[in-house]
Amino acid sequence: MSTTPASQALVTVPPVRRRLLWTLGLGAFGLAFSITTTAAYLPPLLHRFTSSGGLIGAILGAEGIFALTVSPVVGPWSDSFHTPLGRRRPFMLVAVGPMGFCLLLMPFMPNLWTTVVIVMSFFFAYYLFETPYRGLYPDVLPASTFGRSQGIQHIQRGIAIGIALVVGGLLFKVWQPSPFILASILTTAACGLTILLVREDGGHGHVFEGFWAYIQRSWHIFWEDGDVRRFLLANSAWEGAFAAARTFVVLYIIDGLDQSKVLSSAVLGAVATGYVIAAIFAGRLGDRFGLARVIFFASFIYGGGFLAAGFAQEWHDWYFGFITAVSIAGGTVMTLAWGLLYKIVPVEHRGAVSGLATTTKGIGLLVGAPLAGLAIDLSRPYLSATNGYQVLWPICGALILGAIPLLVRLMEIEPRSKTEVPLL
């Protein structure tokens, strides 16, 4: 037989291809490690300067503003930025140093406002790196590997999150600045290796067209390309659900179900386990059966699981199996989402659309968590058994299930390459 099934491709692809997939994923490792460290250990540091939970939440939530403002400019700019170093890597190179430097300084700031300046600078550098990094994938990989490449990327993301939470937590108890120092070293090394080891086509004569021109181009694509618009709307729903769940899951377990912090850590471990399992297998399934199709069916389990969780008012140990299964479905959706975007976006607009997709992440950060928080406050008098927290899950479920109709059209137009994987 002259073709190679995508489900076997991870075994049969030559070492050069495997190395490229894992080398690209190092960027995701660095990004995940840095943002997880910031989200987990910055609030205790800020608590030294303020007791206002609202202010601390606003500082962390400002990440969404940078996703909304930086990405639509940097994405299309990188499409036209032709240099001997390539289109994407110059932006990544500019960002990697400030990311590491800000992480290193973050725990040593003497007051709230200097800390805020460093945190905002980190968020700016983070999205300056992430947007062209996302656009680098379709530039250097064939479409037949998009599913597996995202699976490998999310395996590395899962490893980074696990190390940041477990090892970082132990280090934080010993010396509070130590997780940030570790994050600075690993983020700089991992992201730097991606820049160093990945090669993209060079060029000459880059032209800066102006920030407003790039913003206009991004939103012109949004309104003119219906398929890209469908994906971006679906991605907003996925990111909104993820942001809401990430923000309130621990409070749901501790305050809503009256359980210990130890149990909440165990639940997060079950979620991480499901995420890694999905990352291992989702890419192969997506390349074989179609990314949109796999996301479509996984969304029913993902969203349906959230809806079912809304009925829980007390803890049972069998929830661990349920949580792991739903996490596998959710991890499948999140793993394959960017691979699907890479398949449907026009080649000349990859950077711009990557910027728009990152912008939808910002919308999720700015809308998903506050909306869920407001719903919890309003539901508290009526859902007293869980202090209102159980309303979180139907909201997340509605967002996931609401995106399913958008996938029907994407299943029809997704380029199919399951029968053959080029052995380059």
How does the language model describe each region?
Residues 107, 189-198, 394-424:
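Multi-pass alpha-helical transporter architecture, strongest
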Residues 71-85, 278-290, 376:
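Helix-to-loop junctions at the C-terminal end of transmembrane segments
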Residues 93-110, 300-314:
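C-terminal ends and interior cores of transmembrane alpha-helices
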Residues 128-141, 332-346:
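Intracellular juxtamembrane helix-capping segments at the cytosolic ends
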Residues 40-55, 247-263:
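Short amphipathic helix-loop junctions that connect adjacent transmembrane helices
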Residues 2-17, 201-233, 423-424:
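Juxtamembrane intracellular "pre-TM" segments in multi-pass secondary transporters
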Residues 87, 170-185, 374-399:
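A membrane-interface helix-boundary motif in multi-pass transporters
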Residues 147-169, 360-369:
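Glycine-rich segments within core transmembrane alpha-helices of 12-TM secondary carriers
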